[in-house]
């Protein structure tokens, strides 16, 4: 384990010479908030196979305990997204209190309108009005759960789509989608938001009813100010410029939040920042550049850890987001603007690469020291016996015990 704290004074001096307010950077890093997903602590994976992991959380109570442990190590993961019905309980207020007693809180509520056999042909867009109403009722129920646990975000992703030309009417499906979203939107708790997620394909392969940011944006505009777009970084076609999408939605006031993960080919749900760390940095650069327009953006992990240790994968994800944010905060924006306005293409690019290539580990170590969390959270995790203890106590979960299908 390398101690990076002795290198902090030199880095702080270097950043100050670039015109960076180091104290302000540290303040911003201490305010960072990354929400972890309950399903990321249980056994989850691909459509081909879910491999069980010793100690993986089997229920919402164990998921909350694991999330609290990740927050204890990182200091920046104070909330947990839940998925209904995977995390359903008989007493939501008691669950809220349980989370608070562990030092975390319930975050976004995610409806599940894709798993039941009734949703084979879609949920809100299903040709059957009975199934449409079933999906709406479930989403309204999730709004009631939000009120009970104090959540302010309903995170909506639909698997709806078609596999063959002529299977259904595109325009009729669009009308059903709008009707279902409006019905759900009308039941949102006061002060809350609906974040509309998109995905360009899978599980449907010919058409998807919410395939891209433009469709999600159009639906949000139809619904009202409480509706915004959720960007899942793995839900795009190869080569899509996600930072540009982020910038547009920020400027329009319609970027609601993120589901962070990494992808190599499709919706791979790999650890965020592992496949393309520069893209993650570029996304955070747009967020920092947007200033107050990014104040209410929600940052959430959405990953299925299939072959990785659940806790270590989650901690790795949170720390990668922290590192990307730190690099974005040390961009010399004054020099960048001068180069951009002067048409100096490569000088502008070098401003970004200089920040990206800066070794920010001493800065992060100093911030963590001031937050009273381990200066090297991963080393602390590896040295701790928490994962070994829960593996002994929980054993290996039986198929589907944690809620995730498979």
Predicted regions mapped to residue ranges:
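Long, hydrophobic/aromatic-enriched structural stretches that serve as scaffold segments
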Residues: 99-121, 142
């Amino acid at each position: 384990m390398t101690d990076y704290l002795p290198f902090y004074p030199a880095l702080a001096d270097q950043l100050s010479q670039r015109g960076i307010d180091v104290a302000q950077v540290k303040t911003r890093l201490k305010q960072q908030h990354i929400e972890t997903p309950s399903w990321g602590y249980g056994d989850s994976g691909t459509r081909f196979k879910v491999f069980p992991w010793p100690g993986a959380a089997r229920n919402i109570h164990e998921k909350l305990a694991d999330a609290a442990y990740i927050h204890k190590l990182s200091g920046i993961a104070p909330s947990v997204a839940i998925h209904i019905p995977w995390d359903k309980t008989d007493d939501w207020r008691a669950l809220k209190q349980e989370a608070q007693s562990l030092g975390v809180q319930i975050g976004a509520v995610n409806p599940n309108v894709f798993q039941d056999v009734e949703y084979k042909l879609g949920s809100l867009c299903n040709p059957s009005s009975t199934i449409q109403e079933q999906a709406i009722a479930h989403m309204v129920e999730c709004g009631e759960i939000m009120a009970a646990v104090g959540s302010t975000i309903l995170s909506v992703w639909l698997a709806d789509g078609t596999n063959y030309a002529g299977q259904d009417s595109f325009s009729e499906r669009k009308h059903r989608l709008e009707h279902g979203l409006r019905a759900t939107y009308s039941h949102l708790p006061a002060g809350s938001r609906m974040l509309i997620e998109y995905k360009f394909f899978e599980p449907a392969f010919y058409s998807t009813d919410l395939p891209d940011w433009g469709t999600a944006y159009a639906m949000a505009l139809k619904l009202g100010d409480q509706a915004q777009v959720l960007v899942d970084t793995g839900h795009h076609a190869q080569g899509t410029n996600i930072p540009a999408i982020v910038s547009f939605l920020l400027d329009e006031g319609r970027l609601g939040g993120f589901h962070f993960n990494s992808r190599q080919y499709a919706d791979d749900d790999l650890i965020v920042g592992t496949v393309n760390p520069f893209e993650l940095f570029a996304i955070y650069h747009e967020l920092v550049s947007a200033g107050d327009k990014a104040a209410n953006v929600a940052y959430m992990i959405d990953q299925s850890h299939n072959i990785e240790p659940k806790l270590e994968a989650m901690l790795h994800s949170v720390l990668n987001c922290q590192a990307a944010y730190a690099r974005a905060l040390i961009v010399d924006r004054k020099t960048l603007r001068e180069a951009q306005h002067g048409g100096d293409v490569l000088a502008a690019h070098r401003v970004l690469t200089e920040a990206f290539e800066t070794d920010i580990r001493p800065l992060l170590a100093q911030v963590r020291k001031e937050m009273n969390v381990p200066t090297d959270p991963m080393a602390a995790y590896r040295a701790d016996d928490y994962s070994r203890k829960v593996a002994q106590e929980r054993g290996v979960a039986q198929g589907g015990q944690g809620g995730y299908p498979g």
